[in-house]
From Swiss-Prot:
This is Heat-inducible transcription repressor HrcA. It comes from Staphylococcus epidermidis (strain ATCC 35984 / DSM 28319 / BCRC 17069 / CCUG 31568 / BM 3577 / RP62A). Negative regulator of class I heat shock genes (grpE-dnaK-dnaJ and groELS operons). Prevents heat-shock induction of these operons. It holds the Pfam family HrcA. SUPFAM superfamilies: GAF domain-like, Winged helix' DNA-binding domain. Belongs to the HrcA family. Keywords: Repressor, Stress response, Transcription, Transcription regulation. One of its GO terms (biological process) is negative regulation of DNA-templated transcription. The keyword Zinc does not apply. The keyword Transcription applies.
Length: 325
């Protein structure tokens, strides 16, 4: 069982290591934190922390650095403390959507870069899966005698366009009729939607085109992976350069692979989650990922991740993500 003094020393070692990136000795701790105890007492407490596997020796110094277990203990305490704090939530994404005329891709790109600037680490923002999204509007526009453009507008502000060839002899009145019906009645329950279409459309070409449009919408949404927007990749590279150059390539490969998508898709709560080193992947030991959710609206949510070295300013990052609605 860790004592109050040992916890204070562990906190000091973690925070000093984050700030200075150097092993910490007993005299340094006393000097920086104005501890009213002898170096011998500090050394004894550090020995106890080492036996608990919370701190460890390095090959190049007589000082100690926090281990993954020590950082995990420190982070768990932080999460416990912040879970009881009420925060004034900031609806920054809503502001960015308005500023960018509801162009959600631009808004999310700017959101990722803003979070990176505030946290000073790399950030990932994942667009909500369209299967969670609601189609607000469907439009059918005839481009020429054979080409029709299908436009889908989602509640998140995202817009999808599909160009397709159709030889149906339908004018704009017919196309608007189909589009308006689908806007009002579209459902992922295919059986119910098909029944509604068949009971509503008496003209064969309207019926065929309506079913064709539904097929295209389902195919388009089903094939889409969640878009990921990254901000501050260079900040991650710079941070890793200072600690372990050899770890940069596997970390970047992980971030750019499906593994990071799978990790983020597992987030189902707005609570802050922190994964450290090999908790993320057996091949990783130098980064931490702090994740949470953000809101497009009351029901539609996406994921946020802040990625940095294991010697991360966790308190700043957790407070930042706690304030995002």
């Amino acid at each position: 069982m860790i004592t109050k003094r040992q916890l204070s020393i562990l906190n000091a070692i973690v925070e000093d290591y984050v700030d200075f990136g150097q092993p910490i000795g007993s005299k340094t701790l006393i000097h920086r934190h104005h501890l009213d105890v002898s170096p011998a007492t500090i050394r004894n407490e550090m020995k106890q922390l080492e036996e608990m596997h919370f701190i460890e020796k390095t090959h190049t110094s007589s000082g100690r650095v926090p281990s993954e277990s020590g950082i995990r203990y420190y982070v768990n305490r932080l999460l416990e403390q912040t879970s009881h704090q009420s925060q004034n939530k900031i609806q920054r994404l809503n502001q960015l959507l308005i500023e960018n005329h509801y162009d959600s891709s631009t808004a999310l790109t700017n959101f990722a870069h803003e979070l990176s600037m505030k946290s000073q680490y790399a950030t990932l923002v994942v667009r909500p899966n369209h299967k969670q999204d609601v189609i607000n509007d469907i439009h059918l526009i005839r481009a020429n005698n054979h080409l029709i453009i299908l436009v889908m507008v989602f509640s998140s502000g995202h817009v999808e366009n599909i160009h397709f060839v159709s030889h149906a002899q339908l004018n704009n009145i017919n196309l608007n009729k189909i589009a308006n019906f689908l806007t009002e009645h579209f459902s992922f329950n295919r059986k119910v939607l098909t029944q509604n279409i068949e009971s509503y459309f008496s003209q064969k070409e309207e019926l065929l085109l309506a079913n064709e449009v539904v097929e295209m919408i389902n195919l388009q949404i089903g094939n889409q992976s969640n878009s990921i927007y990254m901000g501050g990749k260079v900040k991650l590279i710079d941070a890793l350069n200072e600690s372990n150059v050899s770890s940069i390539q596997p970390i970047l490969q992980y971030i750019e692979s499906n593994k990071i998508t799978e990790l983020l898709e597992d987030i189902s709560t707005s609570q802050i989650n922190v994964r450290i080193g090999k908790e993320i992947d057996d091949s990783l030991s130098d980064i931490s990922i702090v994740t949470s959710q953000y809101h497009f609206d009351e029901s539609l949510k996406g994921q946020i991740a802040v990625i940095g070295p294991t010697a991360m300013h966790y308190q700043n990052v957790i407070q930042l993500l706690n304030r995002i609605w």
